């Protein structure tokens, strides 16, 4: 059941219109499974290349690189070694996706 919910959320994220929001929702979705809360934010200890992220959000690598720079500049995400750190709260769209997936 969890696998089908994850698939529904991943598909919904990939169809969201804005790449920066797709990336932010994906990172928070991954943080829900692998993230650890730290004083600076939620640390996601996954080696995720820009190409892999592009594949996961149905985009191109250059667009992902630009969107990650924008998210970093806005203070939503930062890179610490091989880990990503998410700052603030998860996007509200992610809660809506999760709720819709659970109603299935």
Where on the chain are the PLM-derived regions?
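Phosphate-/nucleic-acid-contacting segments
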Residues: 32-104
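Short N-terminal helix-initiation segments at or just after the protein's N-terminus
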Residues: 25-26, 80
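A small-molecule sensor/coupling module
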Residues: 1-24
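Short helix-to-turn junction characteristic of helix-turn-helix DNA-binding domains
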Residues: 27-31
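Short hydrophobic/aromatic-rich motifs at helix boundaries and adjacent loops
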Residues: 22-25, 38-40
């Amino acid at each position: 059941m969890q696998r089908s919910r994850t698939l529904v959320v991943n598909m919904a994220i990939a169809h969201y219109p804005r790449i920066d929001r797709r990336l932010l929702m994906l990172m928070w979705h991954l943080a829900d499974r692998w993230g650890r809360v730290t004083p600076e934010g939620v640390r996601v200890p996954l080696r995720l290349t820009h190409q892999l992220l592009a594949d996961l959000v149905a985009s191109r690598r250059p667009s992902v690189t630009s969107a990650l720079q924008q998210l970093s500049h806005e203070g939503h995400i930062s890179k610490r070694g091989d880990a990503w750190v998410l700052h603030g709260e998860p996007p509200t769209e992610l809660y809506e996706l999760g709720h819709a997936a659970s109603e299935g």
